[in-house]
Amino acid sequence: MKTTFRLMGIADVITLINGLLGVAALMFIILAVEELQNPYFADGVKTNYIWGAMTCILLSVIGDIIDGPIARRYSKRKLLGGTLDVMSDCVSFCVAPALLMFVMFGRWGEAAPIWSISLGIAACWVIVTGMLRLARFQYEEASDKVYFHGLASPANAMVLITAAALIWLQPSSGFGPDVS
């Protein structure tokens, strides 16, 4: 009987690292809001956690780009790699970016409850649609189609964190490190 680790190829290891980068992004996000009433410190410590989460998501996108060609060339077990890839993508490109947006723009203790509720619904929408997209891609991968519909989950994550970073860097936006 073979162990799971013996079934893994190099692409599976890269996929696991991508998933761990998604978990690291979630940990950075949790650290960024350790104190929900005052998430921005003057010395930028909490802001550095936000940038750390964004960096982990970006590195996961890069890993996801390279694990596909490696898997197609050197794959030992296609089923194991495909399942790992979907789980890793869900954490790194659905949950982490949605939670990051919720934390960055939640305005804890300042905003009206309707803002937080709307932002929470938007974050849940990103997660659910991302999961459905990944499930659909996994299902359609078994057929002979050579294309897919919609926005790929890594591209969705990049759109979200790019928009968030651009808003975050604008001092007049009321968000980000220069909030007084």
Positions of predicted regions on the chain:
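Non-catalytic alpha-helical coupling and interface elements of nucleotide-dependent molecular machines
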Residues: S92, G130, Y139, A163-W168
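Topogenic membrane-insertion module of multi-pass membrane proteins
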Residues: M1-I65
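Generic hydrophobic alpha-helical membrane-span motif
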Residues: A24, I70-R73, V91, V95, ...
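Multi-pass membrane catalytic core of lipid/isoprenoid biosynthesis enzymes
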Residues: D12-V13, G44, W51, T55, ...
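Interhelical loop and helix-boundary elements at the membrane-water interface
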Residues: M1-G19, I70-C90, L132-A155
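Alpha-helical transmembrane segments of polytopic integral membrane proteins
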Residues: V23-L26, L59, G63, G68, ...
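C-terminal membrane-associated helical module and adjoining short loops/tails
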Residues: M1-K2, K145-S180
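Helix-coil boundary and interhelical linker segments in multi-pass alpha-helical membrane proteins
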Residues: L26-M54, A98-I121, A163-S180
